[in-house]
C-alpha cells in the first residue's frame, strides 16, 4: 500500500512510524525540523506545502491513502479536496481515500464522520475522540482505560493493581469474575503476559479484562472499591476536549460534575450550555481553590487544558491533595511515560485516536474496530470473519494462531461467547482479539 501523509507533527509522525515497516509512505511538511525528524523513518520526506497541487500531483499516483494531519484544519481539508480534484482529472489513477484531522467543532460534531461531498472521505477529530474515551473510562471509576466493541456487545476495561490491593499475591484463577468475562492480558513493567490460571497477580500490574458490558458491572468490587454515591468529578480546563467531555458527563444521572476554567467569558458560555454542572472561574493550580472544593473527596480529577505542562502540574497537585484518581491529557508522546512515572493514574493522548482510525483503514477489509493500549505496545482488534477467512470452519485448537495473540470474544447474532478450543468460527462472526503489536500483521492473515 502507498500512503501520503501531510504533516509530520506528533500525529503524522506516529502514523508514518506505524505504516512504514510494510508500506510505501510519503510524508510532506513545510517545517524543516519536523521533516528532519520524519527522515529518521524509512519514508520519503518532502519539505513543502502539503496542500500544494504541484507537490500532490507528484506523489498521488498509485496512492491508496492520503492523510492530512497538520495543525490547521483548513489546510487539511483543502489538501483532501485538492487531491480529489487531481485524481478526477487523471485518467486511470485510482481513487485515493482521503482522511483529514479537524479540531474546530464548527466543522465536526462527532469523533469520526464523513464529508465526502467536499472531498474528505473520513474526518477525524482527535479531541472529540479523546473526550469519548475519557467518558467511557469515567463510567468505571477504578479503570484506567475502556473501549467498546461489536456495537456495544463487548467491553474492554483496563485496571491498575495498587500495592494495597487485596488481589496482590493471588492467582488468576482466584479472581471471581462473572460469566462471559476474562482477563485478556497483563502488563508488568516491560512484559506483556497472556495469563494462565496459576499466574500470580503482582502490585502495579495492569490487567486488561474483556467481557459482556452487563457481566462487567461488578468489576469495581473486584479491582477497586465500588462507589456507593454519585461519582464526584472535577474537570480542569474547558476547551474543545473539556467542553465535549463535560456535555457527555452532564447527561449522566450518577455524576456530580464541577469544572474549573480560567477564562471568565468561557465560564459564562459553559454555564449556559450545561444544566447540571457547577462552573468555577479559577486556575487548576490554585491550591486554595482546590481545597475549597474538597478535592480530597473527588473520585476523579481530569486535567484537559491545552498545555501538557499545566495538566501535569494540576494532576500532581490533585494527587498530593488526596484525589482518588487523576487522568491527564498529554499531547506530546514523550510525556506519556513521564506522567505515569510520577504517579498520575492515566495519561491520555488525542494522537492515539487518530492513529487508531488510520490503522483500521490500512490493516484490511475485515477490521471493524481497532484500539491501541499501553502506548501502542498492544492492540485490541475486532474482525468480521468472511467466507474466505482462514480461521473459518475449523476448531480453534486446530488453528495455529500467532504467538502473542488471543481470541477473547466472538459475537454471533445476539450471542456473546468466550470461545474454547473446540469452538468453530463461522462466516459473519465478529471476533475480538488481543494482540501484541508484533503479532498484529500475522493475525490479519487469518481474516483475509
Curated annotation (Swiss-Prot):
Indicate yes or no for the key word Transport.
yes
What's this protein's function?
Part of a potassium transport system.
Q: Where does NAD(+) 2 bind?
A: 232-262
Keyword annotations from UniProtKB, A to Z: Ion transport, NAD, Potassium, Potassium transport, Repeat, Transport
Q: Which residues form the RCK N-terminal domain?
A: 1-124, 230-348
Q: Which InterPro entries match?
A: K_uptake_TrkA, NAD(P)-bd_dom_sf, RCK_C, RCK_C_sf, RCK_N, Trk_Ktr_HKT_K-transport
Q: Which domain of life is it from?
A: Archaea
Designated name of the protein: Trk system potassium uptake protein TrkA homolog 1
Q: According to its record, what are the GO cellular component terms?
A: plasma membrane
Q: Which Gene Ontology molecular-function terms are recorded?
A: potassium ion transmembrane transporter activity
Q: What is known of its domains?
A: The RCK N-terminal domain binds NAD and possibly other effectors. This is expected to cause a conformation change that regulates potassium transport.
Which part of the chain is the RCK C-terminal domain?
Answer: 144-225, 368-448
The UniProt record gives the binding positions of NAD(+) 1 as: 7-11, 29, 70-71, 101
Amino acid at each position: 500500500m502507498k500512503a501520503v501523509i501531510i504533516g509530520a507533527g506528533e500525529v503524522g509522525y506516529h502514523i508514518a512510524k506505524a505504516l512504514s515497516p510494510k508500506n510505501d509512505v510519503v510524508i510532506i511538511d513545510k517545517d524543516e525540523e519536523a521533516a528532519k525528524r520524519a527522515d529518521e523513518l524509512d519514508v520519503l520526506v518532502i519539505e513543502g506545502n502539503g496542500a500544494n497541487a504541484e507537490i500532490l500531483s507528484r506523489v498521488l499516483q498509485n496512492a491508496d491513502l492520503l492523510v492530512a494531519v497538520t495543525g490547521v484544519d483548513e489546510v487539511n481539508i483543502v489538501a483532501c479536496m485538492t487531491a480529489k480534484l487531481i485524481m478526477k482529472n487523471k485518467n486511470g489513477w485510482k481513487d485515493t481515500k482521503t482522511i483529514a484531522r479537524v479540531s474546530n467543532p464548527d466543522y465536526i460534531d462527532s469523533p469520526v464522520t464523513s464529508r465526502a461531498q467536499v472531498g474528505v472521505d473520513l474526518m477525524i477529530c482527535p479531541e472529540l475522540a479523546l473526550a469519548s474515551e475519557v467518558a467511557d473510562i469515567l463510567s468505571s471509576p477504578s479503570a484506567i482505560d475502556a473501549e467498546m466493541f461489536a456495537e456495544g456487545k463487548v467491553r474492554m476495561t483496563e485496571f491498575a493493581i495498587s500495592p494495597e490491593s487485596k488481589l496482590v499475591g493471588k492467582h488468576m484463577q482466584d479472581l471471581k469474575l462473572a460469566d462471559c468475562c476474562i482477563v485478556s492480558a497483563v502488563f508488568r513493567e516491560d512484559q506483556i503476559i497472556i495469563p494462565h490460571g496459576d499466574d500470580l497477580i503482582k502490585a502495579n500490574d495492569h490487567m486488561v479484562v474483556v467481557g459482556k458490558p452487563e457481566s462487567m458491572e461488578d468489576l469495581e468490587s473486584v479491582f477497586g472499591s465500588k462507589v456507593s454515591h454519585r461519582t464526584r468529578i472535577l474537570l480542569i480546563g474547558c476547551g474543545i476536549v473539556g467542553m465535549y467531555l463535560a456535555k457527555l458527563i452532564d447527561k449522566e444521572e450518577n455524576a456530580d460534575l464541577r469544572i474549573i476554567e480560567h477564562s471568565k467569558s468561557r465560564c459564562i458560555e459553559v454555564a449556559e450550555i450545561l444544566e447540571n454542572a457547577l462552573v468555577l472561574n479559577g486556575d487548576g493550580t490554585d491550591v486554595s481553590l482546590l481545597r475549597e472544593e474538597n478535592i480530597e473527596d473527588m473520585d476523579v480529577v481530569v486535567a484537559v487544558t491545552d498545555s501538557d505542562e499545566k495538566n501535569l502540574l494540576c494532576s500532581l497537585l490533585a494527587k498530593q491533595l488526596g484525589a482518588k484518581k487523576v487522568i491527564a491529557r498529554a499531547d506530546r508522546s514523550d510525556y506519556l511515560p513521564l506522567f505515569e512515572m510520577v504517579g498520575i493514574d492515566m495519561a491520555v493522548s488525542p494522537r492515539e485516536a487518530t492513529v487508531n482510525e488510520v490503522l483500521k483503514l490500512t490493516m484490511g477489509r475485515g477490521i471493524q474496530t481497532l484500539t491501541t493500549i499501553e502506548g501502542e505496545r498492544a492492540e485490541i482488534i475486532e474482525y468480521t470473519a468472511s467466507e474466505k477467512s482462514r480461521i473459518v470452519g475449523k476448531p480453534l485448537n486446530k488453528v495455529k494462531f500467532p504467538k502473542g495473540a488471543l481470541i477473547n470474544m466472538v459475537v454471533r447474532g445476539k450471542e456473546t461467547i468466550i470461545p474454547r478450543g473446540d469452538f468453530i468460527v463461522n462466516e459473519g462472526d465478529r471476533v475480538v482479539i488481543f494482540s501484541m503489536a508484533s503479532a498484529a500483521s500475522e493475525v490479519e492473515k487469518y481474516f483475509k
